[in-house]
Every structure is written in C-alpha cells, then in structure tokens.
C-alpha cells in the first residue's frame, strides 16, 4: 500500500474531489455520475482528433464547410430542406430499380412510396434524438469545422431542421419520381431494369 492510498482507506468519509475536476455547468440532479465523468470528444487530446493534411487541407475544409449542415448564414429549416431533398432524390433510385416491384408497371410508384416511407423513418429518428428532453449535443469547433452552427444545436433549431428535412425529403422523392416518369426516360427504364434483373 502506498502513502497515497493509505489515508483514503483509513478514513470512513467519502472522497471529495477537487472543484476543478467537476463540470459546474451540469446540475447534479440532471444526470448521473457516469455522464459527468464521460470523456468529451475533441476537447480531450487523447481522443485522437489530430490535425492532418486530410482533415485540415483547403479542399476538405472548403467542401465540408459548404455542406448545408455547416454552411453559415442559413436557417436550420433551410439546412434540413437541402439535406432532405438530397436524401429523397438519391434514395428514390435504389428503391425504384431494385425493389420487389421493379419488373412491373408500378415500379416507379413503389419506389416513390418506399422513399417517402424511408424519409418518414429518418424524420422519426430526428424527432427521437431530442425526445428525452435534452438539447442536441453541441459540436465543438475543430480543425475542419471552425464555426459549427450554434442555432442548429438547440431544441428549436433541431425541430426546424427536422421539419425541413421531412419536407425536402418528400419533395426530392417526388421530383425524382417526376423525372423518371417523363416520356424520354421511359425508354431507358427497361434497359436499367434488365441490368438489375440479370443477377
């Protein structure tokens, strides 16, 4: 037994920690001791978020900071609208081309309905992210994203993002459905369906 351990073992009182080790922004009744002592990303140097030529290069920083999630000067609702439109538009193709009704006349409509269903599931997950009553986790600044959007990481901002995502996702799916349903693409669809059905 070392000299450091001996006083703690002999005394019957609980060990008191120094105030500098306790996060004073969190009320003790809100969370348990495990959350209070949890390792926080980026601020801890042992996490491994290091500045490398890949994550701190000009191209990477310009690309990441121009994504709708990190772009400055837009509202959370518009962020969600852009992200949702991309998801809805890109999810439509796999559902329409590889779905169980791909060789029928209802392939395009089944793809649309499947995509809208997937957007609804993703929207429900966004809603559940803040359902327990806590605000979303605020992303700290790092070497790639120096100014993360602070208005997005509030309950109101996340709710606006979620509603924009739902509207954009459904709109992107309908837009892709309209594009695939036009006459000039109708001749290409059997070729694409034949490629996927060959396997």
Curated annotation (Swiss-Prot):
**Which PANTHER family has this protein been placed in?**
PHOTOSYSTEM I REACTION CENTER SUBUNIT XI, CHLOROPLASTIC (PTHR34803:SF2)
Q: Which domain of life is it from?
A: Bacteria
Keyword Transmembrane, does the record have it?
yes
Q: Which family does it belong to?
A: Belongs to the PsaL family.
Localization in the cell:
Cellular thylakoid membrane
- For this entry, list what GO says about its biological process: photosynthesis
Q: Name one Pfam family in it.
A: PsaL
Instruction: Spell out the GO cellular component terms annotated for this protein, sorted alphabetically and separated by semicolons.
Output: photosystem I reaction center; plasma membrane-derived thylakoid membrane
| Protein's organism | Prochlorococcus marinus (strain MIT 9211)
Q: Which residues cross the membrane?
A: 81-101, 108-128, 165-185
List the NCBIfam families hit by this protein, alphabetically.
Answer: PRK00704.1-1 (NF001925), PRK00704.1-5 (NF001928)
Going by the UniProt record, its keywords in alphabetical order are: Membrane, Photosynthesis, Photosystem I, Thylakoid, Transmembrane, Transmembrane helix
Q: Matching InterPro entries, A to Z?
A: PSI_PsaL, PSI_PsaL_sf, PSI_suXI
> What is the protein's name according to its record?
Photosystem I reaction center subunit XI
Q: How does it sit in the membrane?
A: Multi-pass membrane protein
Query: What gene makes this protein?
Result: psaL
Task: Answer yes or no on keyword Oxidoreductase.
Answer: no
């Amino acid at each position: 037994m070392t000299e450091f351990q001996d006083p703690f073992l002999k005394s019957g009182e609980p060990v008191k920690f120094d105030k500098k080790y306790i996060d004073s922004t969190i009320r003790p009744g809100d969370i348990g001791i495990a959350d209070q002592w949890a390792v926080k990303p980026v601020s801890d140097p042992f996490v491994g978020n290091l500045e490398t030529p890949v994550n701190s290069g000009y191209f990477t920083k310009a690309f990441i900071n121009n994504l709708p999630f990190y772009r400055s000067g837009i509202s959370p609702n518009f962020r969600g609208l852009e992200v949702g439109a991309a998801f809805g538009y890109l999810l439509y193709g796999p559902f329409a081309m590889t779905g169980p009704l791909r060789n029928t006349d209802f392939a395009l409509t089944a793809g649309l309905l499947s995509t809208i269903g997937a957007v609804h599931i993703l929207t429900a997950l966004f809603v559940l992210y803040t359902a327990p009553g806590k605000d979303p986790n605020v992303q700290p600044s790092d070497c790639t994203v120096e100014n993360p959007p602070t208005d997005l990481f509030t309950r109101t901002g996340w709710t606006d993002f979620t509603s924009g995502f739902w509207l954009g996702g459904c709109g992107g799916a309908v837009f892709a459905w309209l594009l695939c349903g036009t006459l000039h693409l109708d001749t290409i669809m059997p070729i694409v369906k034949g490629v996927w059905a060959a396997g």
